[in-house]
Amino acid sequence: MASTIADNADNNGNSKDSVQYLRKVLTSESSPLAQRFRALFSLKHLASSKPPTEETLPAIEAIAAAFSSPSALLKHELAYCLGQTRNLDTVPHLRKVLEDTQEDAMCRHEAAEALGALGDAGSLAILQRLRDDESEEEVVRETCDIAVDRILWETSKDSKSEKLKQSDFTSIDPAPPLPLSSAEQSIPELKQILLDASLPLFKRYRAMFALRDMCSPPDLPTAVPAIEALAEGFKDRSALFRHEIAFVFGQLSHPASIPSLVATLSDKNEVGMVRHEAAEALGSLGAEDGVEETLKRFVNDPETVVRDSIIVALDMAEYEKSGEQEYILEQPVAA
């Protein structure tokens, strides 16, 4: 059974060395991409410590140091991880990425989403400005729109009074699920909200995460019908929306999502942001028959972000089959 970096640090008294080692791997362009991702998730574990430890800030700074990488895939994952830490020391790093118009739109979108996940009211002005800037990339504007609504919801009375279903997922989502009511909403009702393009994206996302929570545990009678409803979201005009459907399927790791994920990855007319998310979602299903073989068909895909995602997805598939406890990078033990 593999132990986490944090466990090793506590046992060996060299946690500072662990952060330095992980930072070196994460920021090295010569390190294999899959190894860098494992280093990132190890650092995320340390950066998310509650209460904070002496490794928390160095871990945050180590993650942020990798924003100099040319890999859009890696940088967008850095932003996601910082947003999951619940630590406002990450905010300056995320704002810098979001406001850099030379940065890849996928990375800027993830930085905006992370600021929303952190509930950082101090970032509202930046998010609102970019949301309303018609010259901005659509994916950035849409993400800022959702992030603004999430922060306003989190700081409102509604967030205190709404009764939400306890989720099996520990992630900080772009939107909470729709609240429970006296009459529980059916899958067709949630699907109608999910697919209604006239509604605010925030509300549609709330329906998305309500449907997600109806799929866990995977043997629930609602699981497959809810997945089928979510899969209809792949027809939406918004690339941001489609990529979030793929992300949710990655969280669920339910075999019923495989056909729609394979179709999305295989669609060469689909944007890279969506195809890459489908690839990583399939990586989480790597123990299922045929998935690994499907992923290998795209190792030479012409789109860089898809090729990179296949590398990570295949590593995730190996992890799923290996029985490892954590998807992390362990520091080699000195002889």
UniProtKB/Swiss-Prot annotation:
- UniProt pathway annotation: Protein modification; eIF5A hypusination
Location(s), subcellular? Cytoplasm; Nucleus
Top EC class of this enzyme: oxidoreductase
EC number(s) reported in the record = 1.14.99.29
State the taxonomy lineage. Eukaryota, Fungi, Dikarya, Ascomycota, Pezizomycotina
The protein's predominant localisation is cytoplasm
Q: Which cofactor(s) are needed, names only?
A: Fe(2+)
What's the name of the protein? Answer: Deoxyhypusine hydroxylase
Q: Name one Pfam family in it.
A: HEAT_2
Binding-site residues, Fe cation 1 = 76-77, 109-110
